[in-house]
């Protein structure tokens, strides 16, 4: 992990470990390259759809509520700094 990258704080996940690690890496890349939450989410969604097939949903922000249905084995919720990341596959 580079000096700019922050350690993600995992809150909930049912992802395989290697997929979780890759999502953490991609999320740190997104935070380093984009400042607008929508741009971070867009980058992650496109990368995940390409890597793991459609259809991924990505929510990034400082304050939101959620109640979602997801495919088993394809859900993660974590923080990087003050940003929360809710990422799941459905559909």
Swiss-Prot record:
Q: Name one GO biological process term.
A: protein transport
Q: Which CDD domains would you find in this protein's record?
A: DLC-like_DYNLL1_DYNLL2 (cd21452)
Q: Keywords for this entry? A: Cytoplasm, Cytoskeleton, Dynein, Microtubule, Motor protein, mRNA transport, Nuclear pore complex, Nucleus, Protein transport, Translocation, Transport
Q: Which Pfam families match?
A: Dynein_light
- Gene Ontology cellular component list: cytoplasmic dynein complex; cytoplasmic microtubule; meiotic spindle pole body; nuclear periphery; nuclear pore; peroxisomal importomer complex
InterPro entries reported in the protein's UniProt record: DLC_sf, Dynein_light_1/2_CS, Dynein_light_chain_typ-1/2
Single GO MF annotation: dynein intermediate chain binding
Q: Which Gene3D superfamilies match?
A: Protein Inhibitor Of Neuronal Nitric Oxide Synthase
Entry's family note: Belongs to the dynein light chain family.
According to its UniProt entry, the function of this protein is described as: Acts as one of several non-catalytic accessory components of the cytoplasmic dynein complex that are thought to be involved in linking dynein to cargos and to adapter proteins that regulate dynein function. Cytoplasmic dynein 1 acts as a motor for the intracellular retrograde motility of vesicles and organelles along microtubules. May play a role in changing or maintaining the spatial distribution of cytoskeletal structures. Also a component of the nuclear pore complex.
Q: Any idea what this protein is called?
A: Dynein light chain 1, cytoplasmic
**Upper classification of the organism:** Eukaryota, Fungi, Dikarya, Ascomycota, Saccharomycotina
């Amino acid at each position: 992990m580079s000096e700019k990258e922050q350690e993600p704080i995992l809150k909930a996940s049912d992802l395989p470990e290697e997929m979780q690690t890759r999502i953490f890496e991609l999320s740190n890349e997104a935070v380093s390259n984009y400042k607008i939450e929508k741009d971070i989410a867009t980058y992650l969604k496109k990368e995940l759809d390409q890597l793991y097939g459609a259809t991924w949903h990505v929510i990034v922000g400082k304050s939101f509520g959620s109640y979602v249905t997801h495919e088993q084995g394809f859900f993660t919720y974590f923080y990087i700094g003050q940003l929360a990341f809710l990422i799941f596959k459905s559909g």
